[in-house]
Amino acid sequence: MNTSQDTIYAQPNEHISDFQFDNRVAGVFSDMIRRSVPGYTQIINTIGDFADRFVMPNTQIYDLGCSLGAATLSIRRQIQGRQCRIIAVDNSESMVARCQENLNAYVSDTDVDLVCGDIRDIDIQNASLVVLNFTLQFLPPEDRETLIAKIYQGLNPGGMLVLSEKIRFDDAPIQTLLEEQHLDFKRANGYSELEISQKRSALENVMKPDTLTTHQQRLTRQGFSHFSLWFQCFNFASMVAIK
């Protein structure tokens, strides 16, 4: 995968546009997410492990908001010979183009349908695994419940949803503490105060995190009977829900 260094916000900008997954971001995304999201590599690797346990032969896997294909590749490595199909979806043409290059670099007997489109429009059926890896937070809050409902309906009994998100906390001191810890993580990974500030401004209107309670209640309302937080580092978390 592309390892170009993320310097998008390294120079002062008079006007900070809303963050978007354009060609600039796609070109540095691997570096950006590694330096911005604590535990990202572990999450990706564990998604593959979950796939090994939960993906059943002749079913479908959905990677909704696949970006450069890290989760799809992790899954595909673990499910050889199961006659499954992965549907990987992203609404950024730049991300999809680079994802296709990454997929082409590895030989596999598992087909991947790479779709450039809105995850809200995807028909989900015969699914044993659905992945939302830092994707739901970018949807308008009013659209999240509908998507979770669609995922639940499309999952086979015993199927799994992996949901990774940046989270917020109603407890103000905890929110401040873990937000500051995350900023220290970014500083330790080489981001300047200017870069941190400008990216925060760019994300302000496009990424709206939920609390863990909100996530769990939404999943329960839509029918998921088993839920667990399996990973958390500061204000980043990954959850599993089983139908």
From Swiss-Prot:
One of its GO terms (molecular function) is S-adenosyl-L-methionine binding. CDD domains: AdoMet_MTases (cd02440). It is an enzyme of class 2 (transferase). GO terms for biological process: tRNA wobble uridine modification. S-adenosyl-L-methionine binds at Y40, G65, C66, S67, D90, N91, D118, I119, N133, R200. Keywords: S-adenosyl-L-methionine, Transferase. Its EC number is 2.1.3.-. InterPro entries: CmoA, Methyltransf_25, SAM-dependent_MTases_sf. Pfam families: Methyltransf_25. SUPFAM superfamilies: S-adenosyl-L-methionine-dependent methyltransferases. It catalyses: prephenate + S-adenosyl-L-methionine = carboxy-S-adenosyl-L-methionine + 3-phenylpyruvate + H2O. Catalyzes the conversion of S-adenosyl-L-methionine (SAM) to carboxy-S-adenosyl-L-methionine (Cx-SAM). Belongs to the class I-like SAM-binding methyltransferase superfamily. Cx-SAM synthase family. PANTHER family: CARBOXY-S-ADENOSYL-L-METHIONINE SYNTHASE, TRANS-ACONITATE 2-METHYLTRANSFERASE-RELATED. Homodimer. NCBIfam families: carboxy-S-adenosyl-L-methionine synthase CmoA (TIGR00740), PRK15451.1 (NF011995). This is Carboxy-S-adenosyl-L-methionine synthase.
